[in-house]
Each structure stands twice: as C-alpha cells, then as structure tokens.
Amino acid sequence: MTRGLRALPLLLLAACSTAPVSFRAPARLVAQADDLVEQGQAQEASRVYERVLREYPTDPAAASALYGLGRLQASPASPLRSYRAAHATFSRLLSEYPQSRWEREARAWRAVLGDLLAREDESARLRAQIERLRRTDLDLERRR
C-alpha cells in the first residue's frame, strides 16, 4: 500500500509535465524512420520522415527528418536513390533549418551531390555527342 502512495506523487508529476506528448512524438517518429531504414524498409521510412515534415514542421526533429530523408535518397543501396532529390532535400534543410545540428553535414552532402550531378550531366552530354558523331561517321561510311 505504501508503495502505491509513493508512486502517486511521481504519477502526478509526470501528468503535469510541461512537454506535451505531441512534442516528443516527432523525435520518436524520426527514430522509427531511422530504424526502418536500417531494416531495409526505405519506402515506409520515407513516409514516416514525410509525416514528421508535414505534421511537425516547426519541431527541431523536422530537420532530422530532412537529414534522414536526404541520406536515404543519396544512398546507392536505396530503392529510392535519387541524387537530384537528395540534393534538393539537403538544400531544403539548409534553407528551412539553417541553425540545425545537421547544417555542416547537409552542406557537405549538398556539395558532394552537386559535384556528382554536374559530372553526371557532363557524362550525359558527352554520351549524346558520341552518339551524334557515331551516326555522322556511319553516314559518311555509307556515302563512300
């Protein structure tokens, strides 16, 4: 009986906590999404990250959700891999949450992805040029 009475003040104190459950929910959701990424459930993780961004845009966990989403999009092993989307996600993180704890990492990711995208664009341009030259060469061979 005395145990129950000792627990009562703790229960009352917890009920009067200044941090409502909704303020703890975003961090829990980000942790859940991170776990889903580790389990290889990229699609579901993406949905959870997006939920945090939609429902808690002003919570500090929103920056963590963007960071997790950007890493998911940048991962070569991810079925959601899109370097352009990842670059845009890290840019959004830097724009919307410039003082977040992820600022330095997001800046580094964005720089690396920007370089990668520039190289991919140049590679595509060169492949197209090679294809045009190949066709021109074939046309010249036929005319001989």
Predicted regions, residues:
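Short solvent-exposed coil/turn linkers within tandem alpha-helical repeat scaffolds
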Residues: 55-62, 93-107
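Short coil/turn linking the two alpha-helices of tandem helical-hairpin repeats
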Residues: 74-78, 111-114, 118
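Structural signature of alpha-solenoid helical repeat junctions
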Residues: 24-25, 29, 61, 82, ...
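Bacterial Sec signal peptide processing site at the extreme N-terminus
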Residues: 15-32
